[in-house]
Amino acid sequence: MDINLFDFHLPEELIAQVPLEERETSRLMVLDRETGDIEHKHFTDILSYLHEGDCLVLNETKVMPARLQGVKEDTGAHIEVLLLKQEEGDKWETLVKPAKRVKEGTVISFGEGKLKATCTGTADQGGRQLEFSYDGIFYEILDELGEMPLPPYIKETLEDRDRYQTVYAKEIGSAAAPTAGLHFTEELLEKLKQKGVELAFITLHVGLGTFRPVSADTIEEHHMHAEYYHMSEETAALLNRVKENGGRIITVGTTSTRTLETIATDHDGKLCAASGWTDIFMYPGYEFKAIDGLITNFHLPKSTLIMLVSAFANRDNVLHAYNEAVKEKYRFFSFGDAMFVASHAKMGNK
């Protein structure tokens, strides 16, 4: 399948550079995955579309301040490091810039030597393996020295780093935020619970795949970078109970979707407690096994994320919705507006 089938025209001014002042004031496009019908709403209207007995699945990963500015110890040359994945102990898979300056044995110093890293080898597709040394607690030092790893299309400085975290972020380990969750406030989640909507939590640590465009000409040639996921017995039991009682499972974001679909694929359609690494790649032709609806942001042209949404809601429906979003001047990408995708039969207000 040609990658260009997932292209669309996006004016640069529609790429949201900063978060809205209030999380829940973003807009919400409601897309019927079967008919392609569209409604234009506000995010707080999600209350009208989720019913008693439904379950929202939220990714409680927490973004690390994973971007570090350092210098080579021998020359003083500036090096930028992006932490991607903890491999074991103090060894990490990273992206470094400029990569050509970092070879095996190179030592990089951060914060006047408070944190040091030695390159121990190369990683996939141009990355570097670094081993860190320090006195104290690594994540406390990272919190002091690191910057939030905003995507390259965001040029503005983030004034409040909490705005690139969900309000329920808990398990540190991501190199990017699960952005569909950024729209929820604690008050909105409480209103959903009062309505009888269940909240279930999983973890998927967002890694390298988020920053890597599809370089292949056809979808089938592209390989996803593996990301760590975890679902507890408690969450699995809740999801199975919801399904047995006829409720819908609505994933918040592509990361929650990938977690549930990975587990269902690996366990004959069943949802159970599981941990591991997933490189699942969903594009048109994929048959969904676990979810009934999806809340997601508006994604980049030709990205694996728009392919996932197209697998769930039909490519023609999704591209029509995206063109409508451009026409209506929705805000795109990480700090942008949201889309709720589900089937018409259960879409309306109750």
From Swiss-Prot:
It comes from Bacillus cereus (strain ZK / E33L). The lineage of its organism: Bacteria, Bacillati, Bacillota, Bacilli, Bacillales. Gene3D superfamilies: QueA-like. Belongs to the QueA family. Its main location: cytoplasm. It comes from the Bacteria. GO terms for cellular component: cytoplasm. One of its GO terms (molecular function) is S-adenosylmethionine:tRNA ribosyltransferase-isomerase activity. HAMAP family: QueA. It catalyses: 7-aminomethyl-7-carbaguanosine(34) in tRNA + S-adenosyl-L-methionine = epoxyqueuosine(34) in tRNA + adenine + L-methionine + 2 H(+). This is S-adenosylmethionine:tRNA ribosyltransferase-isomerase. NCBIfam families: PRK00147.1 (NF001140), queA (TIGR00113). Its EC number is 2.4.99.17. Transfers and isomerizes the ribose moiety from AdoMet to the 7-aminomethyl group of 7-deazaguanine (preQ1-tRNA) to give epoxyqueuosine (oQ-tRNA). One of its GO terms (biological process) is queuosine biosynthetic process. It is found in: Cytoplasm. Monomer. Keywords: Cytoplasm, Queuosine biosynthesis, S-adenosyl-L-methionine, Transferase. InterPro entries: QueA, QueA_dom1, QueA_dom2, QueA_sf. Pathway: tRNA modification; tRNA-queuosine biosynthesis.
